[in-house]
Amino acid sequence: MLTRREFNQQVATGLLGAAATANSLWGQQERPVLCQATLVNSERLWQSLQELSRFGQLAAGGTTRIGFSPDDLAAHNWLLGMLRDAGLDVMVDAAANIRARRAGERDDLPALWFGSHMDTVPRGGNFDGCVGSMSALEVIRTLNEKNIRTRHPLELVIFRNEEGHHYSRGLFGSRAVAGLVEPEELGLVDEQGVKLEEWILRYGGDPNRISRMTPPPGSIHSYLELHIEQGGILWRRGIPIGVVEGIVGINEYTVVLEGKANHAGTTPMDQRHDALVTASKIILAVRNLVTSEPGRQVGTVGQIEVQPGAQNIIPGRVELSVELRDLSLEKIDALGERIRRRAAGLAAADGVQFSMEKIISYEPALTHRAVRFHVQKAAEEMRAPTLTMASGAGHDAQSMARLCPVGMIFVPSRDGISHSPLEYTRPEEVACGCEILYRTLLRLDRINRLA
């Protein structure tokens, strides 16, 4: 067994050390630890994170462990071994998710589900999804060590391809469980020319059973997920725990502007129909309309494609994306219509044709009040300061909200950085989140069913 000092020295020079040193590189003062875990094994949890980070580790820093990649498969196989060693009944379901069940005293009670995902974005970090996954493993190990048998069965789940890198939509594994995967999605082809259904087969799933894999109504008590915040609110405020009130809804639109491509040197300024100029006005309009209303809604123009794309040709066609997020779907629907009307007027004034199509809409997923209550009480037991907050990023919990009550626990992301090799959460905060997950599950276990 390592001493605390030896363990910290190894961590400082290990796979997670590069992110850990970011604090000193940026000249920031280390903040006091406001939450101490006493029930879970903090060092074992951190070691599990370090071991997981080896799968897809990059020499330049960070991790690339794309869903349905060899590194993703290796990581899942490694965890399957850990779960079997912990005595769980382990399976790979039709969507290639890991499902590991621990029997309860009463099998007639619905199962308590908890977990996250282990895939990453390209050149991502070692904490997004991984904190929740390794904490779920640590919860099981802690229960085993303390000889605690819950009343309810426990179902640890690691969802496949949450990031959705190979294909257009994320949250694949959880959407499959919730019955939200359409048959045509299985035929989508990635950049290698491989269909999604082929990847599912290669990694132990069965695409033919995905349409029938949704658990029976009432068989899931609740779903609880621990995750890094992936934003800077907790970090800036120095608060170790976020109690998530809901995951925002998302509307994504494609705007197409058709102007007139022409010679950049011979066309007078007053005779131009420049689609890029109109696009610039629309981008500013999106920002102004989103910020003109009270609330926490956000809007982003994140992609823009200009044609013909030459320095001596007036842009004749522009396609851009507009994304709106808020806990109220009605608000972002109304905001989208305001943007549509404003953009149409701007385009008409410039003599540019305009169209705007909604391509994706994710409904907001509110967490269950009882689950939030018990997360809060678990934090109070540890004297951990909390902040009730919305999640601006999508998570598997929003798919599971279609099936059962859900809850989420956030831990801070240093400087709000995520999807980056510099993504980092301190060991003490990871352990604090894990113990609140553990305590909350035990509190929920006292309740037969949530109303």
Task: Cite the ranges covered by each PLM segment.
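N-terminal export signals
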Residues: 6-27
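C-terminal segment of N-terminal export signals and the immediately downstream linker at the start
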Residues: 22-57
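Midchain, well-structured core segments that form catalytic/ion-binding scaffolds
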Residues: 35, 161-162, 166-330
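Zn-dependent metallopeptidase/amidohydrolase metal-coordination segment
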Residues: 37, 55-58, 115-116, 386-436, ...
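Active-site-adjacent substrate-binding region
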Residues: 54-58, 193-245, 283-288, 357, ...
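A non-catalytic alpha/beta surface segment that caps or lines the substrate-entry region
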Residues: 57-103
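Alpha-helical metal-binding/catalytic segments enriched in His/Glu/Asp
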Residues: 114, 123-160, 253-257, 268-289, ...
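His/Asp/Glu-rich mid-to-C-terminal helical/loop segments that flank catalytic regions of hydrolases
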Residues: 245-247, 263, 267-293, 341, ...
